[in-house]
Amino acid sequence: MVFLSGNASDSSNCTHPPPPVNISKAILLGVILGGLILFGVLGNILVILSVACHRHLHSVTHYYIVNLAVADLLLTSTVLPFSAIFEILGYWAFGRVFCNVWAAVDVLCCTASIMGLCIISIDRYIGVSYPLRYPTIVTQKRGLMALLCVWALSLVISIGPLFGWRQPAPEDETICQINEEPGYVLFSALGSFYVPLTIILVMYCRVYVVAKRESRGLKSGLKTDKSDSEQVTLRIHRKNAQVGGSGVTSAKNKTHFSVRLLKFSREKKAAKTLGIVVGCFVLCWLPFFLVMPIGSFFPDFRPSETVFKIAFWLGYLNSCINPIIYPCSSQEFKKAFQNVLRIQCLRRKQSSKHTLGYTLHAPSHVLEGQHKDLVRIPVGSAETFYKISKTDGVCEWKIFSSLPRGSARMAVARDPSACTTARVRSKSFLQVCCCLGPSTPSHGENHQIPTIKIHTISLSENGEEV
């Protein structure tokens, strides 16, 4: 994806002295292009670190995003600096051999980035269409094979000119020009852009249709399933509970509905984020892949060098703006970016070993002053959950529950308003260990052993995970 230098159109067989450098223009271009390159390098490194440092982002979908960031990082760190120098000087200063290698690496990285977006679009289609079956369809092994195919195909498309599939090179080594051999131009344009673009658009059209249909069905199911007084859908399944056959069927149906709603909501969010990425990709790369074939097949209609350079750098811009898109459209990435920038990776890894803590509080009348900040979830005659806060991905809930009688391990007072706080880090299906105890410890033999009640909870609010 290398453009003609200023004198490349002259088929000269002699080496011209390099033109003088305009100092003011060189400084201006150096600041602009240098800032763009630095932003692209740091931004893509930030994407990679955000996924690497957060275990909840270790999924096949996020590995695809890391692959995209790796391709963009290679482009911004190994190709763009030489492109910027070429632009500033106005001639190629690194020799013929390096020109050919540089052009091949350019095509390799750009094609890998575009094909990576293609794989992501297929992944989102599967995630939205089959949210419950997605983990069995998209496994880590299959994801790795898909990424290997991306890089293998990109390599095949990029190495053609290195083996002679190009027009004769000019003898002037200060000229590094795009490969305008019509056969290769058609092959690379189809393989690098138009075929992936077609797949991407088809997949996202399917995603839009499925998401619209599923949203309508799931939202109507949510409205009929919850009572008028509840603002949050809550499913609690006590382990070893004795219920009738109809109750088991009803509980399973409600659980299946809640899990499907939760998973679909997450996949829909990811599809929206990556839809923005794809939209920016089309806007950035389409001008270049329109200009390049026109210049190759219709020389009389060749665009001006200025138009070509704008289209050329617009394509490069795509590799620098993806790190902006993620935090702006995804709360998940925004928090991950903030943690990395605050150097909280190590701290989060250490704290992830203790995903649940509890503290004892006074009875519920103490919380009456905070009532306006609470979300009450009535779940039974003896139990009530209160949502206290939700910060940095951690949901804090308070449960008020009467303790069971006759417990062999019971060494605490049976206070019907005993309260504990559960800090839950997961945003999806939650298993919460609620430790219940009194506000004042007893002096029994085993007073340090809390009474444990295990609940499996799935939480969602208006179809969104908590």
From Swiss-Prot:
Protein's name in the database: Alpha-1A adrenergic receptor
Membrane topology (UniProt): Multi-pass membrane protein
Disulphide connectivity of cysteines: C99-C176
Subunit structure: Homo- and heterooligomer. Heterooligomerizes with ADRA1B homooligomers in cardiac myocytes. Interacts with CAVIN4.
Positions of S-palmitoyl cysteine lipidation: C345
Organism encoding this protein: Bos taurus
Motif annotated as Nuclear localization signal, chain positions: 334-349
Entry superkingdom: Eukaryota
Record-level Gene Ontology MF annotations: alpha1-adrenergic receptor activity; protein heterodimerization activity
GO cellular component, one term: nucleus
Function of the molecule: This alpha-adrenergic receptor mediates its action by association with G proteins that activate a phosphatidylinositol-calcium second messenger system. Its effect is mediated by G(q) and G(11) proteins. Nuclear ADRA1A-ADRA1B heterooligomers regulate phenylephrine (PE)-stimulated ERK signaling in cardiac myocytes.
Residues with Phosphoserine modification: S215
Ranges of the Cytoplasmic topological domain: 52-64, 123-143, 206-273, 330-466
Coiled coil: none
